[in-house]
């Protein structure tokens, strides 16, 4: 898992895809943390992304590694409501503390079950990393 977290942190911004009915929706994300050997992300339960995940919990994200290499990760969203997980996200990304706290009701953290991660290149076959 560390490899995925490291790549996402190095890329600084990665793109997170959901579906809205039969339409794809993609948005930039910039926060990820590893906690208890899982890769965690966050959302706000008042957003369209949260509603879309509720309707279809399968998501994919993509991050550039270099000019010709990128990471793709997909899986099923599983929310984790424990305050200690929220606090880990806040500690890793202090900029979120101006919007959220570990005990508020809109800050949602989640990991991906059955997560699959692959590194792609225009010059070689995909490398499965999890």
Across the structure, where does each feature detected by a protein language model lie?
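Short glycine/serine/proline-enriched coil/turn segments at secondary-structure junctions
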Residues: 23, 67-69, 120
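Charged, gly/pro-rich active-site loop segments
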Residues: 72-130
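A short, Trp-centered hydrophobic/proline-enriched beta-strand micro-motif
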Residues: 6-21, 59-63
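A short mixed-secondary-structure module that forms the rim of ligand-binding clefts
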Residues: 32-67
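Hydrophobic/aromatic beta-strand elements that line small-molecule binding cavities or substrate pockets
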Residues: 29-32, 75-77
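A generic structural signal for short beta-strands and their flanking turns/coil linkers
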Residues: 10-12, 35-37, 55-59, 69-75, ...
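Hydrophobic residues embedded in beta-strands of well-ordered beta-sheets
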Residues: 24, 38-39, 117
């Amino acid at each position: 898992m560390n490899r995925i977290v490291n790549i996402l942190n190095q890329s600084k911004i990665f793109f997170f895809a959901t579906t809205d009915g039969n339409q794809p929706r993609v948005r930039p994300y910039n926060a990820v943390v590893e906690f208890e050997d899982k890769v965690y992300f966050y959302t706000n339960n008042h957003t369209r992304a949260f509603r879309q995940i509720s309707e279809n919990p399968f998501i994919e994200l993509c991050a550039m590694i270099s000019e010709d290499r990128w990471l793709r990760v997909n899986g099923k969203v599983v929310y984790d409501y424990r305050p200690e997980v929220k606090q880990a996200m806040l500690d890793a990304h202090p900029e979120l503390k101006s919007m959220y706290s570990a005990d508020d009701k809109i800050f949602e953290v989640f990991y991906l079950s059955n997560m699959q991660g692959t590194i792609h290149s225009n010059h070689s076959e995909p490398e499965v990393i999890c």
